[in-house]
């Protein structure tokens, strides 16, 4: 077994509560339906009732459009996202960031009050690892290998993927509890530095290939 090694940019930098945008959420991608953007919008609608100033920052271009022809050409899921945004009056609560490189992604992690990963399907998402190694407090759906990356209520929050009210609850818990943010940040960084240690992962990968080569030679 070999853990993931992250892009080099994410091994430099550290999340700081005092410097983050309070009541902000960062989501690394949203236009693939399995990434759960629709659940994030449902949760955002709940959060906004208690935190009217909440902002969701997400990569990609805005789905909001008045162009009928454009709507017919794009994926149905994008039209569904637009419908939810307008239904819940979230137009001013979301910032679409366009396409970001690794350094720009890192900046968004560091500026976020909370990183959210509301995916329906995952393996071991690098986005969660990137947030953890930088120390950004994480709220993630409990899918795939995420529970092997992050211990619930010690290094972040895990929740049932199709329960946006739980996502909203845990995000607001971190908005309200600065000490919990500090605790998660410290513990997650410590765990991620081991999981994503580049030298250890390289050594493990070499051992795997060596083992395969030895079996072939036999």
Q: What is each residue range found by the language model?
A:
Residues 16-35, 41-48, 56-59:
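Conserved donor-binding/catalytic core segment of Leloir-type glycosyltransferases
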Residues 120:
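Aromatic "clamp/platform" in nucleotide-sugar-dependent glycosyltransferases that forms part
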Residues 1-13, 17-21:
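Donor nucleotide-sugar binding/catalytic pocket of nucleotide-sugar-dependent glycosyltransferases
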Residues 70-99:
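Nucleotide-activated donor-binding/catalytic signature segment of Leloir-type glycosyltransferases, i.e.
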Residues 166, 173, 180-195, 201-207:
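A short, well-ordered alpha-helix in the C-terminal region of glycosyltransferases
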Residues 99, 107-112:
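Short alpha-helical donor nucleotide-sugar binding micro-motif in glycosyltransferases
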Residues 137-140:
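Short hydrophobic beta-strand element within catalytic cores of glycosyltransferases
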Residues 151-153, 157-164, 173-178:
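Conserved acidic donor-binding segment of nucleotide-sugar-dependent glycosyltransferases
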């Amino acid at each position: 077994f070999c853990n993931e090694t992250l892009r080099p940019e994410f091994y430099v930098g550290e999340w700081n509560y005092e410097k983050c945008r309070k009541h902000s959420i960062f989501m690394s991608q949203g236009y693939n339906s399995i990434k759960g953007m629709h659940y994030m919008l449902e949760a955002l609608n709940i959060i906004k009732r208690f935190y009217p100033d909440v902002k969701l920052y997400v990569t990609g271009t805005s789905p909001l459009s008045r162009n009928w022809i454009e709507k017919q050409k794009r994926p149905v899921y994008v039209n569904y996202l637009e419908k939810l945004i307008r239904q819940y009056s979230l137009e001013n609560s979301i910032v679409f960031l366009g396409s970001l490189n690794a350094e720009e992604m890192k900046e968004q992690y560091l500026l976020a009050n909370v990183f959210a990963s509301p995916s329906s399907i995952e393996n071991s998402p690098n986005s969660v690892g990137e947030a953890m190694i930088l120390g950004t407090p994480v709220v993630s759906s409990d899918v795939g290998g995420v529970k092997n990356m992050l211990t619930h209520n010690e290094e972040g929050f895990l929740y049932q993927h199709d329960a946006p009210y739980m996502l909203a609850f845990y995000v607001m818990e971190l908005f309200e509890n600065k000490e919990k943010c500090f605790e998660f940040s410290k513990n997650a960084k410590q765990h991620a530095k081991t999981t994503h240690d580049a030298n250890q992962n390289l050594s493990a990968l070499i051992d795997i290939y060596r083992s395969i080569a030895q079996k072939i030679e036999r």
